[in-house]
């Protein structure tokens, strides 16, 4: 990845109407995603007496998150790019597809969207607590970090291949479907070990509302490292300097 491709952003970008609209779109998309994903776990607990950690609960979480992410990415794609994830935004920044200023605003919007979604869930359920992400009893923090790195690598690599690559052509809804599928599959693979976050915003909202911060750093460090590796590999190897170009918001 050429260092010169990384953009800080113009001084007035933060207050530009397009940036504000894009940030609002990220807030709404993340709210939709977290409300459905976290809410599905709460509903499963209510119906099965805390059975969300069972195999059936894992499958339910996979389906809910996969479907919800497909929708969240689709509704935001034409406005903000439909990142719905600080790790995806970080990967896009490293590839020169989004400026630092816009990326920071996206992060703020995504984190706020997650917190508001969890607060709405607490209100709508009569005070039920959202469950913060945690490690299984036999999983170390470093096991979890590796899981998050590998799973987020797969997610961000998929984002690059289906949504960022200038040669992608007209894929229509293929990108949101592929992104939803990889998240659902990764939840089946890693959910029993560390919850399979792949998304710092998804972990942040429940942690704030339940005020549970045990090993929370894992769900930032792992996804950001995985996103960075995926962005550097795909942009450096498969896109390359010859085909690299700054993409408009609707194309990343």
Curated annotation (Swiss-Prot):
Chain location of the short sequence motif NPA 1 per the record: 85-87
Q: Where in the cell is it found?
A: Vacuole membrane
Q: List the ranges whose topology is Cytoplasmic.
A: 1-23, 77-103, 165-172, 241-252
Q: Where is this motif: NPA 2?
A: 199-201
Membrane topology reported for the UniProt record: Multi-pass membrane protein
A Gene Ontology cellular-component term? vacuolar membrane
Family annotation (Pfam families): MIP
* Biotech and industrial use: May be used to improve drought and salt stresses resistance.
Q: Which InterPro entries match?
A: Aquaporin-like, Aquaporin_transptr, MIP, MIP_CS
- Report the induction information: Induced by salt (NaCl). Triggered by drought.
Per the record, ranges on the Vacuolar side are 45-55, 125-143, 194-219
- Give the residue range of the signal peptide: none
What is the first-listed, main subcellular location in coarse terms?
A: membrane
Q: Which GO terms describe its biological process?
A: response to salt; response to salt stress; response to water deprivation
Record's keyword terms, sorted: Membrane, Stress response, Transmembrane, Transmembrane helix, Transport, Vacuole
Tissue specificity of this protein: Mainly expressed in fruits and leaves, and, to a lower extent, in roots, stems and flowers.
Q: Which family does this protein fall into?
A: Belongs to the MIP/aquaporin (TC 1.A.8) family. TIP (TC 1.A.8.10) subfamily.
NCBIfam families, per the entry:
MIP
Q: Domain comment text?
A: Aquaporins contain two tandem repeats each containing three membrane-spanning domains and a pore-forming loop with the signature motif Asn-Pro-Ala (NPA).
Q: What does this protein do?
A: Water channel required to facilitate the transport of water from the vacuolar compartment to the cytoplasm.
Report the PANTHER family cross-referenced here.
AQUAPORIN TIP1-3, AQUAPORIN-8
The name on file for this protein is Aquaporin TIP1-2
């Amino acid at each position: 990845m050429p260092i010169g491709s990384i953009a800080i952003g113009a001084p007035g970008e933060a207050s530009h109407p397009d940036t504000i609209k894009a940030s609002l779109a990220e807030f709404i998309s993340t709210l939709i995603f977290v409300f459905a994903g976290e809410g599905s776990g709460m509903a499963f607990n209510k119906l099965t007496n805390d059975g969300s950690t069972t195999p059936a609960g894992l499958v339910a979480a996979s389906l809910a998150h996969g479907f919800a992410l497909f929708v969240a990415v689709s509704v935001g794609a034409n406005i903000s790019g439909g990142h719905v994830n600080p790790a995806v935004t970080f990967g896009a920044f490293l590839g020169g597809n989004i400026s630092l200023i816009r990326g920071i605003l996206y992060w703020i919007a995504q984190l706020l969207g997650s917190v508001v979604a969890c607060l709405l869930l607490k209100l709508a359920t009569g005070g039920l607590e959202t469950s913060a992400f945690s490690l299984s009893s036999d999983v170390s923090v470093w096991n979890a970090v590796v899981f998050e790195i590998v799973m987020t690598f797969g997610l961000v690599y998929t984002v690059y291949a289906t949504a960022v690559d200038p040669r992608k052509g007209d894929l229509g809804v293929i990108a949101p479907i592929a992104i939803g599928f990889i998240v659902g599959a990764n939840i089946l693979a890693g959910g029993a070990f560390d919850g399979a976050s792949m998304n710092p915003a998804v972990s942040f909202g429940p942690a704030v509302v339940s005020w549970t911060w045990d090993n929370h750093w894992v769900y930032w460090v792992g996804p950001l490292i995985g996103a960075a590796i995926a962005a550097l590999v795909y942009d450096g190897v498969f896109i390359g300097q010859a085909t690299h170009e700054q993409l408009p918001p609707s194309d990343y």
